[in-house]
């Protein structure tokens, strides 16, 4: 992305990137030590596994791992002029009193994140184009592009959800006079917003933030608590047994002697988060067209005024003729 920074801003940006990199490496290392694949959180996995975050069907790929559906909202201007900075506000609502299951089975606050898919030509606004007022609204949020050649797709998160249920994206509109691939008109914007951990890792393995089901039909023979969760033993009709291991997090809802069908729930659903996506539209408006519309309405108003004046003039002439 072509950004223009002052020396102080550049040093500040490099320091911020270094801090983010150090924190990310530390979190990834700690998460891997605590539990395998615990660091498999979007948006990093989406970037590594998908060329685009939106499938041909229109589904944003985050929904492949975050199975629960939750609302997501977005606010953008109806129309913008070329080479103009505006804000897109993504809202990710949830009950702040909710706590999610963490990788080790304990409870903690929810994290949030979002993906903003802008039309081609639109991109994250350079720092020197963002007003101080807008910077205050954005806060200390770090944005990244989905890839080096996709400046119009912006990612953010994971972030602490309690402080970021509304995320403000600073966006710069393109100028068709400078970019011949951009045209004035109406465009679509695609938005995805997530709160909480996923239920499935990109590898297909379940996380501990979802329902665990019976691998076979039969009768519950034992429910044993272990250091890592629970072992639930099912005795099948032929007398053989199968053990379903449940990690720390979900709680068993079956008891010894209960009959279960294959695929029936053995645990509750600890997930309190979910993913939602929404589409909206924005118009890249020509300033000449705006001036043309203003001129048209001015001409219409002027014509109406002239008609009223003409009508009054005719009425005066008619009244004078009657008096004569």
Swiss-Prot record:
The keyword Iron applies. Keywords: Electron transport, Heme, Iron, Membrane, Metal-binding, Photosynthesis, Signal, Thylakoid, Transmembrane, Transmembrane helix, Transport. Residues 1-30 form the signal peptide. Its main location: membrane. The keyword Transferase does not apply. Binds 1 heme group covalently. GO terms for biological process: photosynthesis. Heme binds at residues 42, 62, 65-66. This is Cytochrome f. The lineage of its organism: Bacteria, Bacillati, Cyanobacteriota, Cyanophyceae, Synechococcales. The gene is petA.
């Amino acid at each position: 992305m072509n950004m223009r920074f002052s020396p102080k801003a550049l040093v500040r940006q490099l320091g911020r990137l270094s801090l983010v990199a150090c924190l990310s490496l530390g979190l990834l290392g700690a998460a891997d030590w605590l539990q395998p694949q615990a660091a498999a959180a979007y948006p990093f996995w989406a970037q590594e596994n998908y060329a685009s975050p939106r499938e041909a069907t229109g589904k944003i790929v985050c929904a492949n791992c975050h199975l629960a559906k939750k609302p997501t909202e977005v606010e953008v201007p109806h129309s913008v002029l070329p080479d103009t900075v505006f804000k897109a506000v993504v809202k990710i609502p949830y009950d702040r009193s909710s706590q999610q299951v963490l990788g080790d089975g304990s409870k903690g606050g929810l994290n949030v994140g979002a993906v903003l898919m802008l039309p081609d030509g639109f991109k994250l606004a350079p720092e020197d184009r963002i007003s101080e007022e807008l910077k205050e609204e954005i806060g200390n949020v770090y944005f990244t592009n989905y890839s080096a050649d996709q400046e119009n797709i912006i990612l953010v998160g994971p972030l602490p959800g309690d402080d970021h249920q509304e995320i403000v994206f600073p966006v710069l509109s393109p100028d068709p006079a400078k970019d011949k691939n951009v045209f004035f008109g109406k465009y679509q914007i695609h938005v995805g917003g997530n709160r909480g951990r996923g239920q499935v890792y990109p590898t297909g393995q379940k996380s501990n933030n979802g329902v665990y089901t019976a691998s076979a039909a039969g009768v519950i023979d034992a429910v044993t608590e272990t250091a890592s969760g629970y072992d639930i033993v099912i005795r099948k009709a032929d007398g053989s047994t199968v053990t379903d291991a449940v990690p720390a997090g979900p709680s068993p809802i079956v008891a010894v002697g209960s009959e279960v069908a294959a695929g029936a729930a053995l645990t509750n659903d600890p997930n309190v988060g979910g993913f939602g996506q929404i589409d909206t539209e924005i118009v890249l408006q020509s300033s000449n067209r705006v001036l043309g519309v203003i001129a048209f309405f001015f001409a219409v108003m002027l014509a109406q005024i002239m008609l009223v004046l003409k009508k009054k003039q005719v009425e005066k002439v008619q009244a004078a003729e009657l008096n004569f």
